[in-house]
Amino acid sequence: MIMRQASVQRSTSETDISVEIDLDGGGQAVVETSIPFFDHMLTLFSRHGLFNLTVKGRGDTEIDDHHLVEDMGICLGKVVKDAMGDKTGMVRYGSATIPMDETLCAVTLDVSGRPYLVYHVAFSAGARAGEFDLQLIREFFKAFSDHSGITLHINLFYGENNHHIAEAVFKAFARALSMAVSIDSRIQGVLSTKGCL
């Protein structure tokens, strides 16, 4: 079996990030971004998607977390794209609906090579989890979609607790991506009538 692993390093005047992923891992995570709540979300992503993930990142968080969170989306998008390779045998589509107590969220995606984000998640105005600005979650997923080439739809049906909403989003994302990148031996080549993705 081909090893579906990749790594990326990105250094700018604002951030310094390294990310490694194994799409066929067991959900092992080492995540150090200096943003505790974001570390928690990325660890959830690893565990519930069964991806092995190593993330190390630092940035100008004395200003705010925006640059680091967005650049982390760029890096995660790149490693997922690289790890998928030519997408031979891949299921391609993934969807998951996840409850978190009073919250219900669905993520549906297509590893089509066409980046597009639909994000229907509303946090209460000025919502934070600890010191983390929850509006940055959208910026993370936009950067991820743009750099992975994945069409990504994230829909919150309902929810009241902001922490629960964020967790449901990341868990559903993990499960949907895990489904989409899974291999089906019945698929010859890639799952497209065009012959490429």
Swiss-Prot record:
Localization annotation: Cytoplasm
Gene Ontology, cellular component aspect: cytoplasm
Record Gene3D superfamilies: Imidazole glycerol phosphate dehydratase, domain 1 (3.30.230.40)
GO biological process, one term: L-histidine biosynthetic process
Primary location: cytoplasm
Keywords (A to Z) from UniProt: Amino-acid biosynthesis, Cytoplasm, Histidine biosynthesis, Lyase
Pathway, per record: Amino-acid biosynthesis; L-histidine biosynthesis; L-histidine from 5-phospho-alpha-D-ribose 1-diphosphate: step 6/9
GO terms for MF: imidazoleglycerol-phosphate dehydratase activity
EC number: 4.2.1.19
InterPro entries (UniProt xref): IGPD_sf, ImidazoleglycerolP_deHydtase, ImidazoleglycerP_deHydtase_CS, Ribosomal_Su5_D2-typ_SF
Catalytic activity of the protein: D-erythro-1-(imidazol-4-yl)glycerol 3-phosphate = 3-(imidazol-4-yl)-2-oxopropyl phosphate + H2O
Enzyme class of the recorded protein, top EC level: lyase
Family that this chain belongs to: Belongs to the imidazoleglycerol-phosphate dehydratase family.
Record's protein name: Imidazoleglycerol-phosphate dehydratase
Organism name: Syntrophus aciditrophicus (strain SB)
Gene encoding the protein: hisB
